[in-house]
């Protein structure tokens, strides 16, 4: 059906280098002719194509006319919020910080109209929790998310949840995904669903959402088919490539009230997206924390968006009205304009494609008797009337925008035009046009050293390892969450070229003498720790979740303790006079000095580790044939292990897991790594709060510092 519709439209439109009557295949963004003499004919074909398509589809705009959906047409700025972002959730204060987050969004970007609560990926897959579990396991559970939604709603911000259709390999719910989505929407008062990796939602999703909450919109990540515009009020315009003369977003052209959010997640210069949104009366997605990789906006991009949003929100009715004229003639080279009209009010949006500031007469338009003219970006009155025409003068910074308004001298409701112009003028005068976008600095948490044990003091159950200098190789799967900063190695700007592929680097490592546990800490050992100390975590959610009423299950005494977070592990280690091993200490203890791939050699061999066939954890000493050169057990499979490798940049906290586990989520490359792993393999694990960080598949072992002389 989609292909046939594309063929139909192809016969109606012309492209950049075509004659006025030659057909080209329509694309999500319809390219405009570079020759301005073809613009009139191009617009006529656009208009004809729209009318014919509406007729062929028997298009009905019922959902766009319903009051509960009216908000979507003016949802210009959507923020993609990583819920583990420390600006969004304060782990020290143990609370969501919605007010602070929105205030920062207001000052930097001009404020958000909606926020996507991104929850599971890239964490999902380390254990069997599914995407709905991740919402349930957020701080405060679903009740906490409902309170968060209330706080956002009080500030006029809409709330989206995320749907990951590829999540089919984790724990299954007793209900279909459609029912689960409706449950989550109802439970937290969500206003929309972001359809990750999808062109469109299932046909029954719309009716199910309408039954639980009015006005819940659907937004697709991938290009939305035109036949689904009727029941999808929003869609992404992702990686769209514009023509030199600004083109038209087809879905926005087809349905003027359809909101599209421009997004190029790995770009630091968002000029192209901003200009596309501006010329199409469309929106932007703000996304700096990309799954744990920082991709910050430049001051110039922020300044343009702040100026845009004030105008778009004030004149939202114009940008969703029928009278839109793409590409009206502009007077300066490299500048382009669109015209929006409603009720006699005219608004022109302009962009400067060039590297130079343009000044002087930007537009010459017909004069309407009695109208005044205003520069909405500079925030001042303008316009020089000459006979039946008016010259609109101003300036546009390099790659900047402009807007002119023609209206009669009647004030609209709300903030007066005078106040609005003053605010726009202040923003324009303070605009920072620099294009650099330095990000927050990543810092490695210092290791809290133990006392230096002498050789005869090495605690039972540990093995002493001499200090060593070596060149160590590290492998990791190139995921969108990135990895940590490696000195001397340029981090990839985006992983799309080799996404999901294993990459590696080597570095010089110097290890001082240390001892490391021969086995992971067991349930029985953790019981003793609790008995001796009375340890109780500040947040008890999921703490030792595999125990029954706080009691260790019989038969698991010698299994690795799991459902402990990094702090739970550190607390045990401190009590034992130890600490967690660093990533490098763990790896050296696993592979020894010859750099072997697995603790037992260079090839994986079934039967030497818990590879999942047991269906859960196994006793820590069950695989004697899988010991490392230093005699350490379980350094491959069974459970991932915490290491003392916590890093953070003020936005994202994470640590490195080693060893792999018995569990591996199957069915999608988007899942986190699982199953037994090589000694040199490291996995980046985003941290948020204990209820999520405690997993059925993560345990730990301890290390201790040894005296350098190794003496008695």
Task: Spell out what each predicted region is.
Residues 37-43, 49-53, 57-93, 119-122, ...:
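An acidic-aromatic substrate-binding cleft motif
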Residues 43, 213-361, 367:
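Active-site-proximal substrate-binding groove within the catalytic cores of carbohydrate-active enzymes
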Residues 100-120, 187-190:
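Catalytic domains of carbohydrate-active enzymes, especially glycoside hydrolases
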Residues 125-272, 278, 297:
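Aromatic- and carboxylate-enriched substrate-binding clefts and catalytic-loop regions
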Residues 388-425:
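C-terminal beta-strand-rich structural cap/linker in extracellular carbohydrate-active enzymes
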Residues 454-544, 564-567, 637:
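A short glycine-rich, aromatic-capped structural motif
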Residues 465, 536, 541-687, 691-696:
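Functional-site microenvironments in short loops/helix caps that host divalent-cation chemistry
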Residues 694-710:
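Short, structured beta-strand segments at or near domain termini in extracellular proteins/domains
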